Amino acid sequence: MGSAHDKKDILLGMMLIKVRQRHFYCFYICLFWSIKGLCSPWIGSLEPQLHQDLQVLVEWGVIDASVSSYPVPWKGVAEQLEKLQVHTLPSIPSISMQRLKHYLQTHKKQKGQSIISLYGATDDSRFVGFNGVQGEKVTLNITKEFYAGRWAGQISANHERGGESHFDKSFLAYQFGDWNLRVGSLNQWWGPAQSSSLIMSNNARSVPSISFSRSQAIRSENKWLQYLGPWFLTAQIGQLESQRAVPDTKLWMMRFNFSPVSGLEMGMSWSAMWGGKGQPHSISDWFKVVTFQTECANGAATCDDALESKLGNHLAGLDFKYSMMLFERPFSLYGQRIGEDVVDYYRVTDNANLIGLSTYLWGNKVFIESSDTNVACSNASTNEKNCYYEHVTYESGYRRYGRAIGSSFDSDARMFTLGINKNFRDGDLLELVINQLTLNKDKQKPAPVLNGMSEKILRLSGFYQAAYGDWLVKLGASIERGEVEDADAKTDALVFTEIKYRLN
């Protein structure tokens, strides 16, 4: 379309504005000291471990909320936390409860928080976890939260090695009743797994978007909705970066999760790439995408049904988690199934799968997970793989700045993970994870995470996090042994540290 249409899309990309480096900190400092704040509307938006604490309380049946979409709103959860007493809980959930209550009470007194953090590693990381190593080698971040009446916001200024500066994880939100309207970007994670999500994870940089979401994830007081149990809904329209095959591609994202019976949580996720430079991107075009209208793959005005293809690049699917008490501890079974193409309005094909199991042993949370994104193309005449996260029009794939928006291990990857989380009574954290990976076994069209055409990897990673007054220090490392076709096995090690200082 012409430039007139491009101007109409400015709102979708308003958080992608680039500024010169000499203005970057000046802009932030002016806002930093002029805004009085409270705490974030979401749990763990600055400290992801708080989300894992919340999951612990839900698994132990202490909190009644739907928590498979990160981040979860504080509203409704905070009221339940304030009623809990330490002496009534077993050791593991009592530690998580105290961490969450401490965070909540501290920020009520402080009227918000301002944080400066520095992350440094010996190298860039190929794989990113929910709460561990980051992708970039060096990042300086300054964050300020603020709150005024129904308004809430966060300004997050980031400066990376090489001189790039951006405002990822900055947002402005307005709450009305049980709903929330947000403009900006926020790390998200959709699904019950800890090592990866097939559709939305924090592996890639957060997508700037306009979001309309429920402002709580607890039971509704509406009698017509009470049968859902605790539930959460979000719908978002975002815009990807300009440095891709189709610049400024739009991204539609929608998620609904609910807990209809005690111990069971179910979720439905959907995302669709559409628009961008050279592609139709009006409101009517978006409506055609979300109503699954078709076009001829050969570009003709009419064609046989076999040549019809849905507009846009769709991913959609389901996830579940069922927790039960066995031997006086929770056992959780969970899974996720996300497909890329649809035969009709409801039958999704080209499916990738993830399954996991978690429980608590010797004071630790232990989880085992397996996923497979080796997916045969439903429209291919052979058993060709290399289709997941890929698209004939959107050649950069379901990625942002080269990293998959979904799985940390990208497409054509088999993953097996064993992990341990330990929360200490003094607030310290320990995580250890072992990954066994097989990447691009068919040696065709390797994903960006590969060092060669095909690779087998055994990886050990972990971190220890401790608080010292207003300081929060995380030390971690990863070591991986990779076997690449026609090359000697190679061992790579990475050490990282993240230091956060609370300024108020």
Protein language model features and the residues they cover:
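N-terminal signal peptide c-region/cleavage motif recognized by signal peptidases
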Residues: S34-K36
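Transmembrane beta-strands of outer-membrane beta-barrel pores
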Residues: G120-D124, A148-R150, A157-G163, F176-D178, ...
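Well-ordered mid-protein domain cores that form the structural environment of catalytic cofactors
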Residues: V133-Y227
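N-terminal secretory signal peptides that target proteins for export/translocation
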Residues: M1-Q21
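Short loop/turn motifs that connect adjacent beta-strands in outer-membrane beta-barrel proteins
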Residues: S66-S68, L89-S91, Y103-Q113, Y147-G153, ...
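Outer-membrane beta-barrel "beta-signal"
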Residues: S209-F212, F256, E395, A466, ...
